[in-house]
């Protein structure tokens, strides 16, 4: 895609660790290098609090962010859909190397959505076990003949939502 408007959206609400600050800075530098708008949401807007009785989440997992889960704040990126041709939603703990190519240039023009199927990544054995357990916990009850999550020896197929790329010209809103 030529002459497109692009944005990387990140969520960094609540107390920030040195890791998050370092990673967000790497994304900012990457955006400057590739002429990409960079937006970091630093104050929650949705304030979605999980139900600890139904979610199985520990209280500590969301109280450290003020009583809600920042993952839901990623949805605020959708507010920018009319303004950009492409948007990437990037977790605040992802570091982008200085020599990384422009991810938008690697996104196929005929793909509306890009993400990583986590089990297909080159991963260590200890992490394979983590993915198998996680996917079984999340998708085991949902899997049926009506909805196929394509299970294999590494668990169910799911995308790691830490990096999402959207080609908005192919998404009808």
Give the role of each language-model region.
Residues 172-173:
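Conserved small/polar residues in nucleotide/adenosyl-binding loops
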